[in-house]
Regions:
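Short amphipathic, positively biased membrane-proximal segments
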Residues: 1-195
Length: 195
C-alpha cells in the first residue's frame, strides 16, 4: 500500500512536470513560430497596399491581448485571479480573431497557408490556457465555485521561473512584436487605412 502511494505521488509529480515542460518548451515556441509565419504571410499578401493599417492594428491588438496572459503566467502566481484574466483575454482574443478575418475578407487574399497558420494562432492559446488550468486545477475549481477558496490576488510567483527562460520568452515576444510594429509602419507609410 505504501509503495503504491509513493508510486502515485511520483507519477503525479511526473505528469505535472511533463505538463509544465510541454507548455514552456513546446506550446510557447510553436505559438511564437506561428506569429512569425503569420507576419510573413501578411507581407507576401502585400498587406500595406490591400487591407492596410486597420488590419495591422487589429494584429497588434491581438498581440497585446495574448501578451497580457503570457506576462501574467511568466511573472505572477497562477491562481484564480490570473486564470480569470487568462480566460477573459482568450475570449477577447478569439473575438478579435473573428474581426481580423472578417476585415481581411475581400480586401486581400488570405492563402490556404495563412489559413493553416491561423489555425495554430487560434488553437495554441487554447492549449496554453488548458495546460495552465490543469497545472492549477485547485484554483480553477475554486474560481468556478466548485471546491476550495479562490485566490484572486495578482502577485509575484513564489517560485519564479528561471531567469534564462523568462529572458528567452521576453526576447521571443519582443521579436514577434517588432515584426508587427514593422508591419504597421509599412502600412502607415503606404497610406492605406481602409480601402
Amino acid at each position: 500500500m505504501r509503495d503504491s502511494l509513493h508510486s502515485d505521488i511520483r507519477r503525479r509529480h511526473g505528469v505535472e512536470q511533463a505538463t509544465q515542460v510541454g507548455l514552456q518548451l513546446f506550446v510557447m515556441p510553436v505559438w511564437m513560430g506561428a506569429g512569425f509565419a503569420d507576419w510573413w504571410c501578411h507581407r507576401r499578401s502585400d498587406i500595406e497596399d490591400t487591407a492596410g493599417t486597420t488590419e495591422s492594428a487589429i494584429h497588434l491588438t491581438m498581440m497585446a491581448e495574448s501578451s497580457l496572459a503570457t506576462l501574467l503566467g511568466l511573472f505572477c502566481e497562477v491562481n484564480a485571479g490570473v486564470l480569470a484574466v487568462t480566460y477573459g483575454t482568450l475570449a477577447i482574443h478569439e473575438l478579435t480573431a473573428i474581426l481580423d478575418v472578417t476585415y481581411a475578407d475581400g480586401r486581400r487574399e488570405v492563402t490556404p497557408l495563412e489559413q493553416y497558420v491561423h489555425g495554430f494562432l487560434g488553437r495554441v492559446p487554447m492549449m496554453a490556457t488548458m495546460l495552465l488550468t490543469v497545472l492549477h486545477w485547485d484554483q480553477a475549481q475554486a474560481a468556478g465555485g466548485l471546491r476550495g477558496s479562490p485566490d484572486w490576488r495578482i502577485r509575484p510567483k513564489r517560485r519564479p521561473l528561471s531567469r534564462a527562460y523568462r529572458a528567452c520568452v521576453l526576447a521571443e515576444m519582443g521579436a514577434v512584436d517588432a515584426l508587427y510594429i514593422e508591419e504597421l509602419t509599412r502600412c502607415a507609410r503606404a497610406g492605406t487605412a481602409t480601402p
